[in-house]
UniProtKB/Swiss-Prot annotation:
Belongs to the EF-Ts family. This is Elongation factor Ts. Its main location: cytoplasm. Associates with the EF-Tu.GDP complex and induces the exchange of GDP to GTP. It remains bound to the aminoacyl-tRNA.EF-Tu.GTP complex up to the GTP hydrolysis stage on the ribosome. The gene is tsf. It comes from Campylobacter concisus (strain 13826). It holds the Pfam family EF_TS.
């Protein structure tokens, strides 16, 4: 019997098995669709396909950094349960897959599936792992960042395998880049804990900032109502939420207000130049709350909470003898954006006993 493309398409859609596997199964079954499904299941491929409708929202985030800190890859591979995520075989699968993505320069899931790992097509290798481990597994996403001779990349994955970060930096020289690797890893650890969304306030959309500013003021004003009732100090209500709202005109206005304040306090003008920089720094701290929450450079460093990441980078640049600029930031948190399946255990038991 002739095996048509439509037959292969139908079998693939109903089982989730690979195109060539479906074609071979239909050939062995002489075109019998049900028998072809049985053949796939007997080979373990049908078993993998049968699990494909179950949501995989657990798993591992894996990070692979090359020995010279010039290339780093992060991946998220999902399983259905945390139990499987702790399985050594699954952990090895995640590690091997991430290393394969990096060494082969793979950019997309489609490229990954058609690549070859240990002499086997990756799609088939992965389905074999699904059949062996016994749960639906999904390579959900991955990304690789690279650096030239004057750049450095590093990464960090939290011990529970649920959060991973990559950061890439451009440096003034190759020597500075070589010295900065451990510092960049420390920044990755910070980002894993503090969850910045972007590198800088320059990466924030202005419309988003305006909406968030309205929400921020409302939040602080609401909290102030309770603080006032309790007789506690009130929150400062900021004029701005991000540096992207503070241009030259806004800074000039703030400086003038500081000068008027100093004049009212009777401070001699000859010492204003020593006082104003500190007050301007305080002005920025009070009016960049959104940057402190969402941007890497605007956050206070977990290892020294008196300084922002931007300030720490400036200090490290001076220490190492050349400029360091963060140019790439990737953070994966396991299952973000996925809806975790909640089983109705009673309904499941009832279904099984009929």
């Amino acid at each position: 019997m002739e095996i048509t493309a439509q037959m292969v398409k139908e079998l693939r859609e109903s089982t989730g098995a690979g195109m060539m596997d479906c074609k071979k199964a239909l050939g062995e079954a002489n075109g019998d669709m049900e028998k072809a499904v049985d053949i796939l299941r007997e080979k373990g491929l049908g078993q993998a396909a049968k699990k494909a409708d179950r949501l995989a929202s657990e798993g591992l985030v894996s990070v692979e950094v090359c020995s010279k800190c010039k290339k780093a890859t992060i991946s998220e591979i999902n399983s259905e349960t945390d139990f499987v995520a702790r399985n050594p075989q699954f952990q090895a699968l995640a590690k091997d897959t991430t290393a394969h993505i990096q060494s082969s320069g793979i950019k997309t899931v489609e490229e990954l599936n058609t690549s070859t790992l240990n002499g086997v097509k990756f799609e088939e290798y992965f389905k074999t792992q699904i059949a062996t481990i016994g749960e639906n597994l999904v390579v959900r996403r991955f990304e690789t960042i690279s650096a030239d001779d004057k750049g450095v990349v590093n990464g960090y994955v939290h011990s529970n395998g649920r959060v991973g970060v990559l950061i890439g930096a451009a440096c003034e020289s190759a020597e500075v880049a070589n010295k900065a690797a451990e510092f960049i890893r420390n920044l990755c650890m910070h980002a894993a804990a503090m969850k910045p969304s972007v590198i800088s306030y320059k990466d924030l959309d202005k419309d988003f900032v305006e909406k968030e500013f309205i929400a921020l003021r409302a939040e602080l004003e609401k909290e102030n109502e309770e603080l006032k009732r309790l007789g506690k100090p009130l929150h400062h209500i900021p004029e701005y939420a991000s540096r992207c709202q503070i241009g030259e005109a806004e800074l000039a206005k703030a400086t003038k207000a500081i000068e008027e304040e100093l004049k009212a306090e009777g401070k001699p003008e000859k010492i204003w130049d020593k006082i104003i920089p500190g007050k301007i720094e305080r002005f920025y701290a009070d009016n960049t709350v959104l940057d402190q929450r969402l941007t890497l450079l605007g956050q206070f460093y977990v290892m020294d909470d008196k300084k922002t990441i931007e300030q720490v980078i400036e200090e490290k640049s001076k220490e190492l003898g050349g400029k360091i600029e963060i140019v790439k930031y990737v953070r994966f948190e396991l299952g973000e954006g996925l809806e975790k399946k909640v089983d109705d255990f009673a309904a499941e038991v009832a279904a099984q006993i009929g």
